[in-house]
Amino acid sequence: QAGADIVLTSAQIEKIYPYVLAAILTVVYNFIGAPMPPANAYTAVLGAAAGASAIFVGFLSATKAVILGTSSSAAYVILRKSGFLSMLFGYIKSSIYSSISLAVASIILMFFDPENPVALNIWHLKIENGIFIPWVFLGALSVLTLLRVSRLLFRLLDQV
């Protein structure tokens, strides 16, 4: 029906908000001129992003291992039957994937010369420093998906 309101459930919002916010932050980054890290700190910034994403992956992997280590507990069985664990494991997986993607993008960008930024020409739109657009999106997505997992873990701990 035309003009029908779109209503999202809290579960749907939970699933999509990291992607939507990351896209919004990326648009804002582009709107403010898509600044690159300073040339003297270029590789340090990219290395820090790769290192932070490796820490994220380690934290998320350890979190999943700890949860799986409690698989014989009654609480684990209840959480599994409720569907909470499969949802949480899916969110952990997406957070790990986004963090690994950020690390890979950071390493790839180290091969670009910060003194000669690359502009992307898409249709009739010229995006300065366009090679950083995916990096900014992945950086925001990595942080937002990690925050989502952390928030759900704290909600889980509040129930115990």
Predicted features and spans:
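Membrane-interface segments at loop-to-transmembrane junctions
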Residues: 5-9, 79-93
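Select subsegments of transmembrane alpha-helices in polytopic membrane proteins
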Residues: 15-22, 90-103
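Alpha-helical transmembrane segments
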Residues: 44-60, 136-139
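Long, highly hydrophobic alpha-helical transmembrane signal-anchor segments
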Residues: 5-51
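Membrane-interface segments at the starts/ends of alpha-helical transmembrane spans
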Residues: 42-44, 49, 121-131
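Membrane-helix interface/capping segments
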Residues: 62-82
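Alpha-helical transmembrane segments and their immediate juxtamembrane interface regions
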Residues: 124-160
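Alpha-helical transmembrane segments and their membrane-interface junctions
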Residues: 98-120
